[in-house]
Amino acid sequence: TAITGREKMENLNITNLQRAEIITQALPYIQKYHNKIIVVKYGGNAMISEELKLQVMEDLVLLWLIGVKPVLVHGGGPEISDMLKKVGKQSEFVDGLRVTDKETAEIVQMVLAGKINKQLVNLLGEFGGNAVGISGIDGHLIEAKVKDERLGFVGEITNVNVQPILDLIEKEYIPVVST
């Protein structure tokens, strides 16, 4: 189980005066970002460390609890590569981008929306957050055009339909978007 922020503070053996100082220093930022939407891009390589993952999720819930409206947008490169290996599919990269045929696109979708997204939503819930996971293809959330024919299904974003995200935020959810 994860250590809560309160337990971390207790383990630090800091005085109440020091705690008050920390909160006082944070107050201008809390006021500045209260009721503001922030987008956090959480990349696949940052997800490798379980400890870092837990800290990021806890921090997002803290932001949400103090009135900031986070939107978590995540990838999952390393887990995608692992799954492709498991099914015997070789990853090929051109200029740092994965060549993505139809079969690879289906595996990517399965890993991002079916596995990683659900794990992150669950972790946010364990820390007291209220999160909903969606995929970039849900409700035409993200529209794209093919970036380079050599890359297959890899695209460049042409439009983001933000309304589904705004609807979730209005209902006090933390949107978790797989891309």
Language-model features: locations:
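Nucleotide/pyrophosphate-binding catalytic subdomain
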Residues: T1-T179
